[in-house]
Structures are given as structure tokens and as C-alpha cells.
């Protein structure tokens, strides 16, 4: 199955309510999305990376430490065991770790417009449960996703789809929390996605030049079992078709290019209106 990922022409934006048009950050919905760099579009259209370049889920602490140079850091592919990988690295000038710690909980509460401005063509809503935990001023900003589920509607290629993202404390995801706060991992968020294709997800970031380097990994084909363990979700001998990670890669490079463009001013304007 071949997919045509043409990102050169703008798509149709999702709908907004009249109440959303009155919000102070509606202007970010109205503006054009930031263009995806040509080199990333070339990677998208260039086909999957080799299976041996897909970092195994069991080696995820290498990713956190920044000791994963033998693996790809931008691209998509299918691993030898049939699971799939999406990886992306985004330089975000003018962005700080504090802004990203704020962004991930902020966009999941309040108006649906908060999620829409991230990618106005593909994002419909993201709603946190329990929202009371997210908005609790006693919860540290970098912990406001821990144990929180985001109920989402977005389009990563095939059409709008419902998704549940189960965010985890890093230790519950199998991460060594002593790595957090070190040179290659200032902070992170991690979650298990429940949808038509289960996946484990991590976004981490650290200072780089005059901003941050934002690094994403999606291990497609993993789920949470009854005991709370993250396990492979596909049968032996079955492989995820390459168009699945390709579609997610296309979406990822689009949404995080746009987030990098809007976050510095958005944070300056909205950081006190959680």
C-alpha cells in the first residue's frame, strides 16, 4: 500500500466554535502553519530506514542518555520483530524546557482550541482526565502529565480517529529517573497510546544552541498488559506495514515544526492563564 504524503499545499483546518474565536490565542489558529523543512520531507518520501537502525524498545534508556548514535534519529521504519519506529529530532530556537513542561499539560485542559492551535489541520481536541490534577497548583509542572489520560481526536493520515494517551511517570515507563536533568535529557513526557494501533511514545528535550533539541520516539506495536507492563502487542510473525509509521512521521514533523514556531510567544502570553 502506498500513501501520498504531499505536504506542499495547505490542508483544510478543523472547525472552531464562536466561543473559541474570542479566545486570546485564536490568532495562532488563524495563521499559516510553519513549513516543514525540505530535508524532513525528503526523508518522509525516501522510504523506511533499515530495521537495524530502529532502536529497540528495550534500549529506551540509551535514548534518554543520548547514547543511541548507532540508531536513526529522524525517520521511520519496521524493526526485525515486526514492530515499527518513528523518530524525529526538532531544533526549537527560542524555546526553553520550562515552556515544554508547561505546554504538555496546558493544551489538555481548558478550551479544545489549545490543542487545535498545535496543528489546526489535524487536531480536534485533547481532554485530560483527571483535569483537577492537571490544574492543581500544588502539582509540579513537570509532573502534571503523570498518571493522566488524554482523550484525543486527531488525524494522522487516514482520517480523524479517537485516541487515548495514557501518560506515565517515567519510572513506570521503565526509565531510569536519574537520567532526567542530565545533559541530554532535561525533561520528558512518556505515554502509551491506545487506538487502532497501540504505541509507546516518548518526547524528551534538552538545551541546544539558543533553544532546545526536542527528540521523539514512537515504538508502534506495544501496549499495557493487565499487570501494567509494557509488552509487544502484535503476534509473532506479523509486521506492521511501513505506511503506518510513515503516516505518523508525516504528522509528527508537521505538528512539532508548528509548535516550535508558536511556543515562545504563546508561552509569554498565556503562561499565567493555566
Swiss-Prot record:
Its cofactor is Zn(2+). Catalyzes the hydrolytic C-C cleavage of phloretin to phloroglucinol and 3-(4-hydroxyphenyl)propionic acid during flavonoid degradation. Also hydrolyzes other C-acylated phenols. It comes from Eubacterium ramulus. Homodimer. The gene is phy. It is found in: Cytoplasm. Belongs to the DAPG/phloretin hydrolase family. Optimum pH is 7.0. It comes from the Bacteria. The keyword Protein biosynthesis does not apply. GO terms for molecular function: metal ion binding; phloretin hydrolase activity; protein homodimerization activity. It catalyses: phloretin + H2O = phloretate + 1,3,5-trihydroxybenzene + H(+). This is Phloretin hydrolase.
Amino acid at each position: 500500500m502506498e500513501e501520498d504524503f504531499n505536504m506542499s499545499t495547505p490542508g483544510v483546518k478543523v472547525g472552531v466554535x464562536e466561543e473559541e474565536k474570542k479566545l486570546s490565542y485564536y490568532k495562532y489558529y488563524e495563521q499559516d502553519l510553519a513549513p516543514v523543512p525540505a530535508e524532513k520531507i525528503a526523508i518522509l518520501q525516501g522510504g523506511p530506514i533499515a530495521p537495524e537502525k530502529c532502536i529497540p524498545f528495550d534500549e529506551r534508556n540509551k535514548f534518554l542518555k543520548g547514547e543511541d548514535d548507532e540508531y536513526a534519529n529522524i525517520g521511520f521504519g519496521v524493526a526485525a520483530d515486526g514492530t515499527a519506529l518513528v523518530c524525529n529530532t526538532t531544533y526549537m530556537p527560542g524555546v526553553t524546557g520550562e515552556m515544554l513542561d508547561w505546554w504538555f499539560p496546558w493544551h489538555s485542559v481548558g478550551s479544545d482550541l489549545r490543542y487545535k492551535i498545535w496543528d489546526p489541520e489535524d487536531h480536534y481536541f485533547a481532554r485530560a482526565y483527571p483535569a483537577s490534577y492537571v490544574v492543581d497548583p500544588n502539582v509540579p509542572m513537570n509532573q502534571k502529565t503523570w498518571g493522566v489520560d488524554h482523550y484525543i481526536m486527531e488525524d494522522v493520515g487516514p482520517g480523524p480517529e479517537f485516541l487515548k494517551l495514557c501518560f506515565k511517570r517515567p519510572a513506570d515507563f521503565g526509565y531510569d529517573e536519574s537520567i532526567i536533568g542530565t545533559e541530554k535529557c532535561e525533561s520528558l513526557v512518556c505515554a502509551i497510546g491506545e487506538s487502532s494501533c497501540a504505541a509507546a511514545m516518548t518526547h524528551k528535550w534538552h538545551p541546544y544552541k539558543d533553544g532546545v533539541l526536542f527528540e521523539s520516539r514512537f515504538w508502534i506495536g506495544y501496549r499495557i498488559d493487565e499487570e501494567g507492563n509494557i509488552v509487544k502487542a502484535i503476534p509473532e510473525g506479523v509486521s506492521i506495514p511501513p505506511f503506518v509509521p510513515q503516516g505518523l512521521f508525516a504528522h509528527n514533523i508537521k505538528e512539532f515544526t508548528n509548535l516550535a514556531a508558536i511556543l515562545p510567544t504563546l508561552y509569554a502570553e498565556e503562561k499565567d492563564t493555566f
